[in-house]
Amino acid sequence: MIEPVKRQLSSSGAQLPRSSGRGRTVARKLSDILTGHPGRAAVTMFALVITGFTALLRLPAVSATGESLSLVDAAVTATSAVTVTGLTSLGPDAFSLTGQVIILVAIQVGGLGIVTLGVWLTLLVSRRLSLRTRLLSSESLGVSKLGEVPALLLTVLIFTLSIEALLAAAMLPVFVTEHGPAKGAFHAVFYAVSAFSNAGFVLETNSFDHPVVLTTINIGAFAGALGFPVVYMLYRMVFHRAAMNLHTRLTLEVTVVLLVLGAGLVAAFEWQNPMTLGQLSPLEKVHEAIFASGMTRSGGFSTYEVMDQNDPTLVVTSVLMFIGGGSGSTAGGIKVTTLAVLLLAILAEIRGDEHIQVHHREISSSLVRVAVAVVTAGALLVLTAVVALTAVTDQGITVATFEALSAFGTVGLSTGLTASAPEAGQWILIVLMFVGRVGIITLAAGLAARSTPTFYRYPTERPIIG
């Protein structure tokens, strides 16, 4: 049972054992990052962690051949693991057990959230959470009330480890039967972490032949894509009889609609395709279609080659990848609540409503402005990346667009472009994965100069729209 922290941390902090001088030095440096601008702190921490894992993956012991990986291969793998994407330039057999363990740790760090782990480390060493740190945590986790941050941080940790343990236990008998106790246990843990984190990393190319593994991974990816704020809200509803907030309601509604709609479209377009669903039984087709629909919004696992799909399915998959999962989750994309706010704004405009209302709540115009900014900036970024990818590779616009959307949405479904692209193309995909995980608005805020308040306003005019 998830038991979040009951007490709010005071300004002086919870009393913990005193740390060593070296620990205080580390804490001070970490605190300097965490107490800066929230957006800049998140960007800095992600960049530092990715750099660290890139260095680790360049060690000779990581490679199955004993030779050091190239800088770009290590950077692609590290970025993909920390951003829980799944796009790689190397196959799963390119890594030794040491390399697989490092990738597993990187996925777990990225899935839990670098900011979350940084805040926990700060709390353990310095014994307090400053207001700035709470602001950073609230922005990273997608909560609006600073008082909920400590409880949510503990909920994130307990829920993540509990779900991953359950997923591993469900898959353990299958993998032990196939690989033996030790290797089977490692496979179960690896796929549990990869599924819940929506990372899409695999240890073997034929890992999803068993229906138990397929179903377990689908459930894990679905839970991970909901977002920690939703999980925390559901916990409070069950154990504290709290009322469901609007964010949770919209996230659940849009997630279910997209899952069902995506599965229906995949089944309709691929039902007779012998390369994907055509040779399966009707029940297996439905199961595979649901799995494919869930994986397109961040999971990144696939039971068949992406390019074997028909063109309409590629379009549907591309749209779902751009949307992504829930805010504060392991998923990327523009997020399902962003889509919901935009659709509600369009509906209100069509109806002529002065205010945007849903479920007896009103959505502010400032939130609509943020949603428009997220979608527009994301679309422009992907468009720019597609142009750049087509310029540096010999692939057409379909392949480049799919790969760019997969990187931006931190999905991991691949046409093979990540592995075949020249270094320039791979660095483009690295940037997309980084921005997709950090969030384009967070990145912009982190890179922007300190804002200067204005004490005046200009006259209002209305340009012609449409």
Role assignments for model-derived ranges:
Residues 1-466:
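Membrane-proximal intracellular helices of multi-pass ion channels
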